[in-house]
Structures are given as structure tokens and as C-alpha cells.
């Protein structure tokens, strides 16, 4: 990567190309090296300009963004940030893009949005620095989905699992949760996502994982065999009620620039569950969740961080590790099984 993050903006709308370019040019560490209005123009521009990162509209005429993304990942793997409408259809397409290999997704702004595209410039810089392209290029295209541990081989103890993730988290969560049996420990997750995206993601996880996965609702009781995903962009997820633990959705300002925030979730788990918890921090940029994971460890919880080699962005796990919050760092493929080891009931009774 050069000193500046060099980005190509691809969108069929001249207005949207101009807006994205203006947002990116406002950051002195980002250089917009070109624009393209369709896949053919984009392919030529990538060959000519060799950008570090591409922003790509999902909904384009002729060859759409998903089709073009597949070609990029097959022929020239590189970090691509998808730009999508904040609709259910847009969310489904964004999730498909992330599974194909997109670095991240951002939503198109609503009229009057004070911060159009949010932290897009930061995402572009993180993408340019990341190992994402190299990781994608070396991953087998036909890798089989992880198989869940059979229910007969796992007996849940009394522990609750809390997981936090951001950039790269969609693929990481799929890899972890597909190892879980249908009788997995109650699991609460905060993944940084735009509004509407988490509902689609929960539905997707529910189809491909053995446990029940749902978007968290206020007051939902934590149950064995259920996974609860914080709704994107609206409220923070906590756990509450020591005698009958449940989800609590909290109206509060963003924490660490995020709502929902991983720190808010981890803080509540540290206070409520103490040593009867496992905290996991996965790939993501920034530091959200690091301080909360440290609180969990100090409260007696077991803690796991994703290692640098398998992270799309080694940000949140790095800060957590440097703070002393991470008991053990593991490659992504080992984390699901490790969570199950840490939460299984002891032979003499639930721990």
C-alpha cells in the first residue's frame, strides 16, 4: 500500500459517485484515483489505475455488483466495499456480497443524513492496510461448511457466551456458529451492522446453523439452543435479570462510535454472569469491546480473541490482547470448538 489509500469509486449514478468521492476526498489519507459507471468501465480502471480498494454499488445495470464482485474475487482478489440501499433486499444482497468476499458494506444515506456514508473513509483505509485480499486468495473456493458438534457429544453448563465483531464479522460468525450444536449455550452477539441488515443476517444464520438464531428483542429470555443478535444501528444489547437472564435493548448514545456497542454488551455480561461466561472478540477495526472483555476477564470469565493471521482487520482483537483482556488467541477455525469446551457441563454437574 502507498502512503495514501487509493480508491476507485464504482456506481451507475453520477450523483452518488460524486457524493462518495467528496466524502472520501475530505480525508487527507485517502486518494480517489478514478470513477466508473459500470462493470466494464470498472474493469478497465482497475487494470489501468491499480487501486488499493474499490467501492462498488450493488445495484447496477448490465452486470450487477454481485456478479462483478465474483469476477474480482476469482481473477484479482482485492478489498471491495459494497454500497447498498438500506432495504431488506439490499441487506440480503450485502450479506451475499460479504460471503463472496467483500471487505465490508455501507448503506446509502437517507436525505438530510448528517454523516453520509458514516465511517466509509476509515473503512477504506482499513481495507487498504488489511491482509484481506491475500487471505481470500489463499482460501479454498470449495471449502466445506464447518459441521456442528453432535448434540449427544455436548452438554451445556450454566455459562452464557458473548461475542463481539465488526469488519469481517459476517464470515467469522458463520464459521464459529456453524460448529455449535442445537443445544448450544445461550449466546448473545453484537456485530456492527447498519439498520435492517441484522434481521437478514439472523435469518441467514438461522437457516445454516443448528441452533435457533434470532434478532434480539427486549425481554427475550436467554435459553439453551438459542443465539441472539443485537439489532443494527438502533439500540444497545445488554443482558439483565440475574435470576432469569434476558436480553435488554437500551436507548443510549453510541459508545466508541457504535450503536450497538460490543463494550455495552460485555460490561453487562461481566456484571451479571461473572465467571459463568465466555467472552469472544472477533475481527473488526477500532477498539470496541476491548475494555468490556477486560472487565469480563477480571470478573472471572474465560476470554478468547481471534488471532491476527485469520482476521480481516486485526483491530478490536489486537487492542483487547494488548490490554490483557484475551486469555488465549486462536485461529478462527478453532474458536467454535474452544467455546464449546469452555462451556460444557462438568461430569459431576454443571459448572
UniProtKB/Swiss-Prot annotation:
Similarity remark: Belongs to the CheB family.
Protein name: Protein-glutamate methylesterase/protein-glutamine glutaminase
Active site: 166, 192, 288
Gene Ontology CC terms: cytoplasm
GO biological process: chemotaxis
Reaction catalysis annotation: [protein]-L-glutamate 5-O-methyl ester + H2O = L-glutamyl-[protein] + methanol + H(+); L-glutaminyl-[protein] + H2O = L-glutamyl-[protein] + NH4(+)
MF terms (GO), sorted A to Z: phosphorelay response regulator activity; protein-glutamate methylesterase activity; protein-glutamine glutaminase activity
Residue stretches making up the CheB-type methylesterase domain: 154-346
Chief subcellular location: cytoplasm
Residues found modified as 4-aspartylphosphate: 57
Stretches assigned to the Response regulatory domain: 6-123
Compartments, record wording: Cytoplasm
Highest taxon of the lineage: Bacteria
Protein EC: 3.1.1.61, 3.5.1.44
UniProt cross-references to InterPro entries, sorted A to Z: CheB-like, CheB_C, CheY-like_superfamily, Sig_transdc_resp-reg_Me-estase, Sig_transdc_resp-reg_receiver
Domain statement: Contains a C-terminal catalytic domain, and an N-terminal region which modulates catalytic activity.
Maturation and modification: Phosphorylated by CheA. Phosphorylation of the N-terminal regulatory domain activates the methylesterase activity.
Function noted in UniProt: Involved in chemotaxis. Part of a chemotaxis signal transduction system that modulates chemotaxis in response to various stimuli. Catalyzes the demethylation of specific methylglutamate residues introduced into the chemoreceptors (methyl-accepting chemotaxis proteins or MCP) by CheR. Also mediates the irreversible deamidation of specific glutamine residues to glutamic acid.
Keywords: Chemotaxis, Cytoplasm, Hydrolase, Phosphoprotein
EC top class named in words: hydrolase
Amino acid at each position: 500500500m502507498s502512503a495514501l489509500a487509493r480508491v476507485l469509486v464504482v456506481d451507475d449514478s453520477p450523483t452518488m459517485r460524486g457524493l462518495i468521492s467528496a466524502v472520501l476526498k475530505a480525508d487527507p489519507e485517502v486518494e480517489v484515483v478514478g470513477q466508473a459507471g459500470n462493470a466494464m468501465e470498472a474493469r478497465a480502471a482497475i487494470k489501468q489505475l491499480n487501486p488499493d480498494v474499490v467501492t462498488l454499488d450493488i445495484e447496477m445495470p448490465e452486470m450487477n455488483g454481485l456478479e462483478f464482485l465474483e469476477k474480482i474475487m476469482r481473477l484479482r482478489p482485492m478489498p471491495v466495499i459494497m454500497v447498498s440501499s438500506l432495504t431488506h433486499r439490499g441487506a440480503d444482497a450485502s450479506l451475499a456480497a460479504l460471503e463472496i468476499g467483500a471487505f465490508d458494506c455501507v448503506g446509502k444515506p437517507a436525505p438530510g443524513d448528517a454523516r453520509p456514508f458514516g465511517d466509509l473513509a476509515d473503512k477504506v483505509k482499513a481495507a487498504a492496510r488489511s491482509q484481506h485480499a491475500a487471505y481470500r486468495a489463499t482460501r479454498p473456493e470449495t471449502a466445506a461448511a464447518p459441521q456442528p458438534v453432535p448434540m449427544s457429544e455436548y452438554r451445556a453448563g450454566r455459562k452464557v457466551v458473548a461475542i463481539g465483531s465488526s469488519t469481517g464479522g459476517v464470515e467469522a460468525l458463520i464459521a464459529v456458529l456453524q460448529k455449535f450444536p442445537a443445544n448450544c449455550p445461550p449466546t448473545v452477539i453484537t456485530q456492527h451492522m447498519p439498520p435492517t441488515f441484522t434481521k437478514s443476517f439472523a435469518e441467514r444464520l438461522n437457516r445454516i446453523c443448528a441452533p435457533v438464531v434470532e434478532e434480539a428483542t427486549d425481554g427475550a429470555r436467554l435459553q439453551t439452543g438459542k443465539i441472539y443478535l443485537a439489532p443494527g444501528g438502533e439500540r444497545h444489547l445488554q443482558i439483565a435479570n440475574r435470576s432469569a437472564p434476558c436480553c435488554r435493548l437500551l436507548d443510549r448514545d453510541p459508545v466508541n462510535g457504535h450503536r450497538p456497542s460490543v463494550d455495552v454488551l460485555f460490561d453487562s455480561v461481566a456484571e451479571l454472569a461473572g465467571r459463568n461466561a465466555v467472552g469472544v472478540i472477533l475481527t473488526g477495526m477500532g477498539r470496541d469491546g476491548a475494555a468490556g472483555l477486560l472487565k469480563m476477564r477480571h470478573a472471572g470469565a474465560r476470554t478468547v480473541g481471534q488471532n491476527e493471521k485469520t482476521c480481516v482487520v486485526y483491530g478490536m482483537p489486537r487492542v483487547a490482547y494488548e490490554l490483557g483482556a484475551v486469555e488465549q488467541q486462536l485461529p478462527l477455525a478453532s474458536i467454535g470448538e474452544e467455546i464449546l469446551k469452555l462451556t460444557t457441563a462438568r461430569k459431576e454437574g454443571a459448572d
